[in-house]
Amino acid sequence: MTLGIFRRVFLMLSVALGLTKGDLVKPSRGQLVNCTCENPHCKRPICQGAWCTVVLVREQGRHPQVYRGCGSLNQELCLGRPTEFVNHHCCYRSFCNHNVSLMLEATQTPSEEPEVDAHLPLILGPVLALLVLVALGTLGLWRVRRRQEKQRGLHSDLGESSLILKASEQGDSMLGDFLVSDCTTGSGSGLPFLVQRTVARQVALVECVGKGRYGEVWRGSWHGESVAVKIFSSRDEQSWFRETEIYNTVLLRHDNILGFIASDMTSRNSSTQLWLITHYHEHGSLYDFLQRQTLEPQLALRLAVSAACGLAHLHVEIFGTQGKPAIAHRDLKSRNVLVKSNLQCCIADLGLAVMHSQSSDYLDIGNNPRVGTKRYMAPEVLDEQIRTDCFESYKWTDIWAFGLVLWEIARRTIINGIVEDYRPPFYDMVPNDPSFEDMKKVVCVDQQTPTIPNRLAADPVLSGLAQMMRECWYPNPSARLTALRIKKTLQKLSQNPEKPKVIH
């Protein structure tokens, strides 16, 4: 069959080039044109004919060949359509065939299958389109549901599963910190999601111990153990989600970081509540503690050292399978530092925290419209000069705020029988609820810092604490101390401490 095709092609070529007999067209002498002649039968590079021809032929196993010549026979070949083997072109001006390029039809693989019904595409088209739309809709719905479940920490119902919790010996934690080894999530940062839901549903709220613009804090009871339940307001959902995300993905088990137990979205009194359940510390926040108590120097150092240890743990990146990214708090203040029963501090409220990993160089800022506390904002934040794409910038703002927390501790420390009432930083320079502009004028324009009590110079240990505050408040952020340096310096100042006492 293939041989027959090539015989026909050769015949057409011969006829086209005037090499065979056919229906003779007898043009007048005036109709003859000069043509380029490039084929095996040419005696000269120029020939004369009624028209010029170009024939592109592909023979089996060979590249397509181009033949040029004159035509005077079988003019109907000029009207033929190109095929996958031959393409014939005619023109009627002298040398019009010299630079003509032709193409063959695309090669078609012979098939012995019956021809497809012409109506089949009309039937299959709408069906396939419908299937694609259904698949895309299903995929979109699945992704939306998955995102919602991830935000709420709801992956399925566990029911009333039996739990085996082991009590922790650290601090005054009332609930077990860890599940048995074969039931942990691997993060060491809390209970698995499903267990968290069960714990949350078994917690009974006992009394409200604090309120703020972003929610309430309750003392709760779980199987006779006291827990703290932070109930977020609906407008602060992103803080709840962010804190839940960090606790569930980062290794944050540390004596000086508030112990996380569970997080859940629950319904109480026909309204949705966002719960964050943590260890309960009866002394409350450092802010509350300092208003009630005065401090001996060694207790002041104990509070300062433990808070610095917590901040240093947040700021450092730990590598390895049990590692953690570096974290900047972004809302450090005495209200977000809790006092444990052993008179050590632990840092709480990670709703604005920023995470950074050196290996991926990824800065995870989160998606929280809430801003930090204006009274504790560093000058570069107030004048909007902070580099938001640089993780170190966020750590430097934490150091500024930590210096203010140290100042609050120092005011309540007894030296030579003298102590001052508790006051918040800049109490004598701005209103009780300062605006952004109030703080910007005091800190950036007037370049003021809280007044350090002169009596600190009378104590060799607390004079070192006073110097540390000044180094936390440098206007140049990069010149401030690091959390690790603060921790080591405070530990050195508190060598050979006496047993701390609370003075009423």
UniProtKB/Swiss-Prot annotation:
Q: Name one GO biological process term.
A: regulation of blood pressure
Query: Residues where Phosphoserine occurs?
Result: S156, S161, S162
Report the InterPro entries cross-referenced here.
GS_dom, Kinase-like_dom_sf, Prot_kinase_dom, Protein_kinase_ATP_BS, Ser-Thr/Tyr_kinase_cat_dom, Ser/Thr_kinase_AS, Snake_toxin-like_sf, TGFB_receptor
The membrane topology term of the UniProt record is: Single-pass type I membrane protein
Catalytic activity reported: L-threonyl-[receptor-protein] + ATP = O-phospho-L-threonyl-[receptor-protein] + ADP + H(+); L-seryl-[receptor-protein] + ATP = O-phospho-L-seryl-[receptor-protein] + ADP + H(+)
Keywords per UniProt: Angiogenesis, ATP-binding, Cell membrane, Disulfide bond, Glycoprotein, Kinase, Magnesium, Manganese, Membrane, Metal-binding, Nucleotide-binding, Phosphoprotein, Receptor, Serine/threonine-protein kinase, Signal, Transferase, Transmembrane, Transmembrane helix
Q: Does the UniProt entry include the keyword Acetylation?
A: no
Where does the record say carbohydrate is attached?
N34, N99
| Positions on the Cytoplasmic side per record topology | 143-504
- Give the matching PANTHER family: SERINE_THREONINE-PROTEIN KINASE RECEPTOR R3, TRANSFORMING GROWTH FACTOR-BETA RECEPTOR TYPE I AND II
Protein name according to UniProt:
Activin receptor type-1-like
Primary gene name? Acvrl1
